[in-house]
């Protein structure tokens, strides 16, 4: 089993963890529905960048 040769200092430990921070999600407002959503995703009504790309089918 691998064992560290020397103890990592608090500074080195914290530098190692610098990329572990929780970053806030980027939320945008849909241009057609006005709802909040994640970027680069299809809106609830099936539109993407203001154009209809997905049309819901009626349930039978």
UniProtKB/Swiss-Prot annotation:
Keywords: Ribonucleoprotein, Ribosomal protein. GO terms for biological process: translation. It holds the Pfam family Ribosomal_L32p. Signal peptide: none annotated. The keyword Ribosomal protein applies. Residues 1-23 are annotated as: Disordered. The keyword Ribonucleoprotein applies. InterPro entries: Ribosomal_bL32, Ribosomal_bL32_bact, Ribosomal_zn-bd. GO terms for molecular function: structural constituent of ribosome. One of its GO terms (cellular component) is large ribosomal subunit. Belongs to the bacterial ribosomal protein bL32 family. This is Large ribosomal subunit protein bL32. It comes from Wolbachia sp. subsp. Brugia malayi (strain TRS).
